[in-house]
Amino acid sequence: MSYNSYVIKDEKIAVMDTVDAGFTEEWLGKVAEVLDGAKPDYLVVQHMEPDHAANIENFMKAYPDTTVVANTKTFTMMENFFRGMDLEGKKHIVANGDTLTLGKHVLTFVFAPMVHWPEVMVTYDSTDKVLFSADGFGKFGALAVSYTHLRAHETK
């Protein structure tokens, strides 16, 4: 299984999820590289399992002006995971079906409780028609080749 975090660059910048604690420095370095000096506006937290959320506090230390986007259950869990983290004035609580406009990208949040944990939500980017699926559709193991390589081979 691979654990991915994504950056959506538009008029506003959103980072989708964080990564496992074992990859903190590598991940923060890659995020900084992709941002190229820009500051993220939002950190979208779809799932609080540590392999997705372990670096929320580290991210907020690196980018303290970022707003965290999550649902009520996620924020409750976050407060228990990161007891010393102060998100006062930095929370954007979403309900099922809410949207967030980044510019041309519009994100829609869909709750998916018990896909894995009770707070899970997925995020649909209607511009690129991409579903950020948290732990949905996950599979352990790794492909020997990339998915795009497989699809290219199938269409020939």
What is the predicted role of each segment?
Residues 1-35, 122-125, 129-133:
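Conserved beta-strand hairpin/beta-sheet module of binuclear metal-dependent hydrolase folds
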Residues 11, 22-69:
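Active-site metal-binding motif and surrounding structural segment of the metallo-beta-lactamase
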Residues 11-13, 98, 105-107, 128, ...:
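Well-ordered beta-strand scaffold positions
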Residues 47-49, 123, 135:
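Divalent metal-coordination and catalytic microenvironments
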Residues 48-53, 76-77, 116-117, 138-141:
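Active-site environment of divalent metal-dependent phosphoester hydrolases
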Residues 70-120:
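Metallo-beta-lactamase
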Residues 131-147:
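Short, solvent-exposed beta-strand-terminating loops
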Residues 148-155:
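Conserved small/polar residues in nucleotide/adenosyl-binding loops
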